[in-house]
Amino acid sequence: MRVAVSNLTFGYDYRTVLKDISFRLNSGDFLAIIGNNGSGKSTLVKCILGINKVPSGRISLDDIDITEYHNFKNVGYVPQKFDEFNYEFPITVNEILQVSKYSKVTEDEKLELLDKIGILEIQNENINNLSGGQLQRVFIVRSLMNNPKLLILDEPTVGVDAQNVENFYQTVNELNAEGITIMLITHNIRESNAKFTHMLSLHNGEALFKEVPRGDEE
């Protein structure tokens, strides 16, 4: 999926968070979004997802202006925190995948995705028994059930141990190699072995956008 952000400005009350942000991605690109806490990373993602109404500027997905027409059918999103579930209540991986619109996929398609992401064997596990890395993979599977052309990941490795961080980025690299455009927010770009094609650095609401060689995070 192609992504184009043009002259995006956004703020809360009297504070401007994003100032005249512009960048463009082609299908299959892999963007790292970096910046300090409060720099506007999550705000930018919420604008792209249509959660924040954009007062100034333009965002288009595959050349469709989402500020005028919502075009999120093929957009997957993995949040940093999964607040929609009460983890004190017993719920299994399968039950998470069966709720809401994601239950529309067939059983065979679901099993294929679980196997692809490497968590087929835990499909009947209670989520309280999962590691941080396993839980992240569960929600990647859920996002892939939407058959996304764009996958947005918000700080996906927070609280995940080093080995699972490496495994996670290997999975993301493989998804990107299949042609999925990926936007990934990270607070520590050096921890990843992700094969980024572009980097967007946010500071005080302003952005520096650049192309980087595959796998070069410097």
Regions found by a protein language model. Name each.
Residues 49:
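Helix-to-loop junction immediately C-terminal to a conserved catalytic motif
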Residues 198-212:
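H-loop (His-switch) and adjacent beta-strand-loop-beta switch element
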Residues 107-122:
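Conserved ABC ATPase "signature" region
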Residues 57-71:
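Conserved ABC transporter NBD signature motif
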Residues 186-187:
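H-loop/switch region of ABC-family ATPase nucleotide-binding domains
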Residues 151-154:
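Catalytic Walker B motif of ABC-type/P-loop ATPase nucleotide-binding domains
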Residues 126-130, 134:
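Conserved ABC ATPase signature
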